[in-house]
Regions:
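Alpha-helical, largely C-terminal catalytic domains
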Residues: 1-204
C-alpha cells in the first residue's frame, strides 16, 4: 500500500485559506445598515479592521495596531464550527468555551504548526482580554454592533427586547480599551435609543 504523502507547507496554508471562506456563511444577529439582512462574521471582521485603522488613535494606551488587526481578523474563525453565540444568550454562553476550544483545535490545526500556534495564541490572548491590544479589540467588537443597531433604528434591540442593564454589563470593560470611544458610543448610539424606548431602561 502506497504511503500517503505528507502535505506541503503551501498546501496546508491554502487548505486553511479555503476553510476560512466558510466564515462568510456564519450569520450574526446584527443587521446591516440597510436593515434588510443580518451581517456575517467575515463582514463583521472586515468592518472592525477598518475601524481599527481609523480609530486606534483613541486607545487608552499605545497599542500594536497590526496585532489588533490580526486578532480581529482571526478570533471569530472558531465560529465556523462553534457557531455564533449571541451577546445576550446566557444559555449559549455556558457551552461557548468548550465548543470554541474544540473548533480552535481543528481550524488552527489545519495550518503548518508554527502558523497554527501563532494564530491559536492570538485567539487565546483575545479570549483572556488582558493586554492593551485585546482591550482595544474588544472596544471594536462592542462598538461596531452598537453603531449598526443605532443606524437600523434599534431593529435587533427591539426584536430581542434588549435591556440597558444587559448592554452595560456587556460593556463593563469597554472603557478600559478606549474611554473616548465608549463615551462616544454611549452618547451617540445607546442613550438616544434608551430615550426613544428602543432599549428598555431597567436601571431606574
Amino acid at each position: 500500500m502506497e504511503e500517503k504523502q505528507e502535505k506541503s507547507r503551501i498546501d496546508r496554508q491554502f487548505d486553511f485559506i479555503r476553510e476560512i471562506d466558510k466564515e462568510k456563511f456564519i450569520t450574526r444577529q446584527t443587521f446591516l445598515s440597510d436593515a434588510k439582512r443580518r451581517e456575517n462574521d467575515a463582514e463583521h471582521a472586515w468592518h472592525m479592521a477598518v475601524m481599527t485603522l481609523l480609530l486606534s488613535e483613541y486607545a487608552n494606551e499605545e497599542i500594536d495596531v497590526l496585532r489588533v488587526l490580526s486578532m480581529l481578523l482571526i478570533h471569530d474563525l472558531v465560529e465556523i464550527d462553534a457557531g455564533d453565540t449571541y451577546a445576550y444568550d446566557e444559555e449559549g454562553k455556558q457551552t461557548q468555551r468548550v465548543r470554541e476550544v474544540k473548533a480552535a483545535d481543528r481550524i488552527y490545526g489545519i495550518l503548518p504548526e508554527d502558523q497554527g500556534e501563532k494564530l491559536r495564541e492570538l485567539w487565546e490572548e483575545f479570549e483572556e482580554a488582558q493586554t492593551p491590544e485585546v482591550k482595544f479589540a474588544h472596544v471594536m467588537d462592542n462598538v461596531q454592533p452598537a453603531m449598526l443597531n443605532d443606524y437600523t433604528e434599534g431593529k435587533d434591540w427591539i426584536a430581542k427586547g434588549v435591556r440597558l442593564s444587559q448592554i452595560l454589563e456587556r460593556n463593563a470593560h469597554t472603557a478600559e480599551g478606549s474611554q473616548k470611544l465608549w463615551d462616544y458610543a454611549y452618547t451617540n448610539f445607546i442613550e438616544p435609543n434608551v430615550k426613544t424606548g428602543k432599549i428598555k431602561d431597567d436601571t431606574k
